[in-house]
Amino acid sequence: MSSVRVKENEPFDVALRRFKRMIEKTGLLTDLRAREYYEKPTWERKRKAAAAVKRHYRRIRSQTLPTKLY
């Protein structure tokens, strides 16, 4: 469980920002969203494979030189 102690004379916004940063760093929110609904193992494998293909094409596209338009 993540918790943030609000320091004396510290604005609420700053404490909230620290809390959000801590939650983001631990990956709690992404894990919670992933477990919101049950995902069948076959769907999970398909989703991960599609993401891997997308990453692969994105990496290839970033490594190729742009076409010259002159």
Curated annotation (Swiss-Prot):
HAMAP family with a match to the protein in the record: Ribosomal_bS21
Q: What is this protein called?
A: Small ribosomal subunit protein bS21
| GO biological process, any | translation
* Superkingdom assignment: Bacteria
* Gene Ontology terms, MF aspect: structural constituent of ribosome
Q: Note the InterPro entries from the entry.
A: Ribosomal_bS21, Ribosomal_bS21_CS, Ribosomal_bS21_sf
GO cellular component terms given for this protein: ribonucleoprotein complex; ribosome
Keyword Ribonucleoprotein belongs to the record: yes
Concerning its family, UniProt says: Belongs to the bacterial ribosomal protein bS21 family.
UniProtKB keywords: Ribonucleoprotein, Ribosomal protein
